[in-house]
Amino acid sequence: MSIEVEIKLRISDKECIEETLAEIGFCKGKFVMESDTYYMAEHHDFVGLDEALRVRCVENRGTGERSAVITYKGAKLDNTSMTRQELETSVGDGAVCREILERIGFRPVPVVEKLRQYYHRDNITACVDAVTNLGDYLE
């Protein structure tokens, strides 16, 4: 189990943010399309418990490589940085994983799609996201 520490900020000038990241030493990484399906269930109150269950399908826009992961996110440990416990593992086929969850009673909520540009410096990862119908974000 790992602890995920993240801060999400809505941004108005994506290009300026990307230039600033480069100026302070971040190196551009992979560029991907992520499609996130979150789930609800009658038998588990994800919202009330501040938890999340997600299947993420990823397409690397540079290589065409595809992958998928299933993730459980525990309740936030810190509301400022959205720190939470996270369990994540690869799945061979995201569509099959989604179908399994739906057949055993999990209900998908609207899919969140985003184009994500990764940036790295030392042990820090920054992502600049263009989220469909929601805008641009720095994470």
Identify the function of each model-found stretch.
Residues M1-N123:
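N-terminal strand-loop-strand beta-hairpin
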Residues H120, T125-Y137:
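Strongly charged, low-complexity linkers/loops
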